[in-house]
Curated annotation (Swiss-Prot):
Keyword line: Membrane, Transmembrane, Transmembrane helix
Protein name (record): Uncharacterized protein HI_1456
Record's subcellular location: Membrane
A Pfam family assignment: DUF2846
Species of origin: Haemophilus influenzae (strain ATCC 51907 / DSM 11121 / KW20 / Rd)
Membrane topology summary: Single-pass membrane protein
Length: 168
C-alpha cells in the first residue's frame, strides 16, 4: 500500500516537471561552482617582488628585461609551461606575469600549446625591457597557447593589473 502511494506521488511530481526543474537547478549550481573553483594557480612571488618588477627599471648594461604575461579570459583553468631558450621558467596561469633578466641578443620564447610548443623569436637590446603576451585559444582537445610581442605601453598597462609568479 505504501509503495503504491509513493509511486503515485513520484509519478505526479515527475509529470509536473518538479523533479526535472530541481535536478536542473542543482546541476547548474554545481556546474558554476566547479567552473569558479577550476581556475589554475601557480606559486606567486611576494607583493614586494611584484611591486619592484612593476617599476619597469632598465636592466644593467649587456642585459635586457623580459616580461611575459597572461591576461586572457579564455582558458582560466589551464596552466601552460613557459621557456626561454628551451629552459623552463615556470607555469603560467591567468592574471600573472614573469620577469627575467636575460643577456641582450637573440632568444627563443616558447609556450606549451595543444600538440607542441609555440615559439616566438625575438632580438633584444642592452638596457631595454621587452613585453610578451601569452594568450590561450580554443583547441581540438584542450586549449592551446601562443605568444605575441606587444608594445612597452601595452605591456606596462596590462602588467600593472597582474601579480608576479615565481620563476625558475
Amino acid at each position: 500500500m505504501f509503495l503504491m502511494w509513493a509511486l503515485r506521488l513520484v509519478y505526479v511530481l515527475v509529470s509536473n516537471g518538479y523533479f526535472v526543474k530541481q535536478l536542473f537547478a542543482r546541476a547548474s549550481i554545481i556546474g558554476v561552482a566547479l567552473l569558479l573553483s577550476a581556475c589554475a594557480t601557480v606559486p606567486m612571488a611576494s607583493v614586494e617582488e611584484s611591486n619592484t618588477a612593476k617599476q619597469f627599471r632598465s636592466p644593467e648594461k649587456g642585459n635586457s628585461g623580459l616580461y611575459i604575461y597572461r591576461d586572457s579570459f579564455i582558458g582560466k583553468a589551464l596552466k601552460k609551461d613557459l621557456y626561454i631558450d628551451d629552459k623552463f621558467i615556470g607555469e603560467s596561469a591567468p592574471d600573472v606575469f614573469f620577469y627575467k633578466t636575460i643577456k641582450a641578443g637573440e632568444h627563443k620564447i616558447s609556450t606549451e600549446s595543444e600538440f607542441s610548443n609555440s615559439d616566438l623569436n625575438i632580438k633584444t637590446e642592452s638596457g631595454k625591457n621587452y613585453f610578451i603576451r601569452q594568450y590561450t585559444k580554443f583547441g581540438v582537445f584542450v586549449g592551446g597557447a601562443n605568444l605575441e610581442q606587444v608594445s612597452e605601453e601595452e605591456g606596462k598597462k596590462a602588467i600593472s593589473k597582474l601579480n608576479m609568479a615565481v620563476s625558475h
